[in-house]
Regions:
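N-terminal positive-inside, membrane-proximal cytosolic segments immediately preceding the first
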Residues: 1-28, 52
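Short solvent-exposed coil/turn linkers within tandem alpha-helical repeat scaffolds
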Residues: 82-89, 103, 117-126, 153-161, ...
Length: 209
């Protein structure tokens, strides 16, 4: 009888505890499950969006290669509308700038490069856009603006040689060959792109005095 009463007391204690705490326990479990499944849904959504952006960018690249600027602009606009803040958005703006330059629309290209710089989620992509924008500014004769942009964006080790090459071009355009030589030499040492072209520029500089 004692054992029965003890078991009965245990059952009653459990019932009482559940009556007081059952709702909060169920609520906590529900919240926990919601958090787990909500996180999974969010991850799945992000992966799906990334796949859509990747496919849209591949289509944009293919269209650009066909030489149809209007179609490229349309596809770029659609991609940017949905994925403008992603890396694919920055890449789309870089492609759009190329389209506009080929179409002899430097102002439109400039706008695309500025957008790529402003919204690129990766500093490396932003610097690629900055390099192209600096070259565009120099081609338009905006040397001071190009110099300011280079000074702002030449941070860290990435693309340091390419920024040095642009500083050499600026110095050469300003009639400072010694400064240009030093910048070109630095660019070559840092592994800038088109090192052979930079070496030709160095060889064609007037001899140091």
């Amino acid at each position: 009888m004692n054992a029965y009463e003890t078991d009965e007391e245990k059952v009653e204690a459990i019932k009482g505890w559940w009556k007081e705490n059952g709702i909060s326990v169920v609520g906590g479990l529900a919240l926990g499950l919601a958090a787990v499944f909500g996180w999974r849904a969010w991850v799945d959504h992000q992966e799906d969006m990334a796949q859509q952006a990747s496919s849209a960018f591949e289509q944009l690249v293919a269209t650009v290669e066909t030489g149809n600027p209007e179609a490229a602009r349309t596809q770029a606009a659609l991609l940017l509308e949905k994925h403008g803040d992603s890396a694919y958005g920055a890449l789309a703006n870089l492609m759009l700038a190329r389209v506009e330059m080929d179409a002899k629309q430097p102002e439109a290209a400039r706008k695309a490069l500025e957008q790529a710089m402003a919204k690129a989620p990766d500093p490396g992509l932003a610097r690629v856009a900055a390099l192209r924008l600096a070259r565009l500014l120099m081609a338009q004769g905006e040397m001071d603006a190009a110099a300011t942009l280079i000074a702002q964006q030449d941070k860290g080790e990435a693309f340091k040689g390419d920024f040095a090459a642009l500083r050499g071009d600026l110095a050469l355009a300003a009639g400072r060959p010694a400064e240009a030589r030093a910048a070109y030499d630095q660019a070559i040492a840092l592994g800038a792109a088109n090192a052979a072209l930079l070496q030709l520029k160095v060889e064609n500089l007037p001899p140091a005095t």
